[in-house]
Amino acid sequence: MRNQNQPVAIEGYPFIGLFAFITLVFALLGWSVCTLLFLGLTLFAAYFFRNPDRYSDAEDAAILAPADGKVVYVGPALEERYFKSEVTKISIFMSVFNVHVNRVPMAGKVVDMFYNKGQFLNAAMDKASLHNEQSGMLLEHTSGRRMLVVQIAGLIARRIVTYPVVGDILQRGARYGLIRFGSRVDIYLEDDVDIQVTVGERVCCGETVLGFLK
């Protein structure tokens, strides 16, 4: 799995390298305003693609937040692709200032994946779950419980990265992907989950407990 140890996600290297090179060129030319501008862009790119370590000692039944951000929806939702029924959905919106590396919320096996091209609506809107570009991963816990995790592109985000493939065994809290520049992650949970978060709450990827498997 990529990005397990680097302090900055490798997807950010091209942006950081480009801005740093342009900064150097302007500095050599003596163009101070442009130098400061691109130095700022270099630092922002490094900040945006930051990849901090996260740790949780929560019990095995705990489901961890797959993304940093704000909870914008908790409640019932119809999931037609896999569950074909109404399940519990939790949606987390990531602004451009949040860490954008995503982590595995529940240990398990990747039993299926999908990718849909789509629109780039504001990821804070509920209809983004239906219409935006998205990449989904269906996990199966050792208990047989399943969970669908969906990375959704936003108004600015135009690139979803997902590292695992079908058949991979993932550890809870491991880095599994990234979405560039503002986005959303939806989790669909089967019944018998004790939800611990509410709408408006800020969550920390890989640390905040969203709920417990019963």
Curated annotation (Swiss-Prot):
Post-translational modification: Is synthesized initially as an inactive proenzyme. Formation of the active enzyme involves a self-maturation process in which the active site pyruvoyl group is generated from an internal serine residue via an autocatalytic post-translational modification. Two non-identical subunits are generated from the proenzyme in this reaction, and the pyruvate is formed at the N-terminus of the alpha chain, which is derived from the carboxyl end of the proenzyme.
Pathway annotation: Phospholipid metabolism; phosphatidylethanolamine biosynthesis; phosphatidylethanolamine from CDP-diacylglycerol: step 2/2
Cofactor note: Binds 1 pyruvoyl group covalently per subunit.
Site residues (Cleavage (non-hydrolytic)), renumbered to this chain: 182-183
Modified residues (Pyruvic acid (Ser)): 183
One annotated GO biological process: phosphatidylethanolamine biosynthetic process
Source superkingdom: Bacteria
GO CC entries: plasma membrane
Membrane topology type: Peripheral membrane protein
Subcellular location: Cell membrane
UniProt-annotated catalytic positions: 183 (schiff-base intermediate with substrate)
Broad enzyme group: lyase
GO terms, molecular function: phosphatidylserine decarboxylase activity
Reactions performed catalytically: a 1,2-diacyl-sn-glycero-3-phospho-L-serine + H(+) = a 1,2-diacyl-sn-glycero-3-phosphoethanolamine + CO2
Subunit structure: Heterodimer of a large membrane-associated beta subunit and a small pyruvoyl-containing alpha subunit.
HAMAP family referenced in this protein's UniProt entry, alphabetically: PS_decarb_PSD_A (MF_00664)
Name the record gives this protein: Phosphatidylserine decarboxylase proenzyme
